[in-house]
Amino acid sequence: ALQQGDIDMVWAYSTGVAGTYQDVLSTDTNVSLVNVAAANAPAVLAFNNAKGLFSDENLRQAVSYALNYEEFKTYFGSAYAEIPNRGFVPSTTVGYTDTEKLTTDTAKADEYMKAAGYTEKNADGFYVNADGAAAAFTLTVNAAKETHVGYAEMIKTQLEAFGIQV
């Protein structure tokens, strides 16, 4: 509708224009895009730190380094997408303290798994501890948000390829 002149403006306050549309709209000479740094966290992977698998910080760090952020950027971002920094607070927040970019480093993720006591992999390719229990967890997602379901599917695929059962 925007490209055909049926509407004059798209305003999606909390989400902006989806990355897949940004790439198309950016080449249209009749459309102007205004890009503003995000002041929110559109997707967050939150852990239960109090009990279970992720009560061990080493496992949370392993997940962080096992994920392929370039793949997330490619599939869910746009030409304007950037891999965020570590931490929960967006850089546009007043008082923000700079942190390093999220990076993929499966060797470092493997070191964190070993530090948590998951030193071997079973026949299915999942890390196991000394008791033979696999590193496994349940990922819960709001199914009403299609993009979040896509994030969850990619997280599952990437972590299971690394050796954590989801």
Name every feature range the model reports, one short phrase each:
Residues 7, 29-31, 81, 118, ...:
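Short aromatic/hydrophobic-glycine micro-motifs
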Residues 43-45, 135, 164:
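Structural beta-strand/beta-sheet cores of well-ordered domains, especially the beta-sheet scaffolds
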Residues 51, 92-93, 163:
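Short amphipathic alpha-helical interaction patches enriched in hydrophobic/aromatic residues
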Residues 2, 8, 139, 157-166:
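Periplasmic binding protein-like
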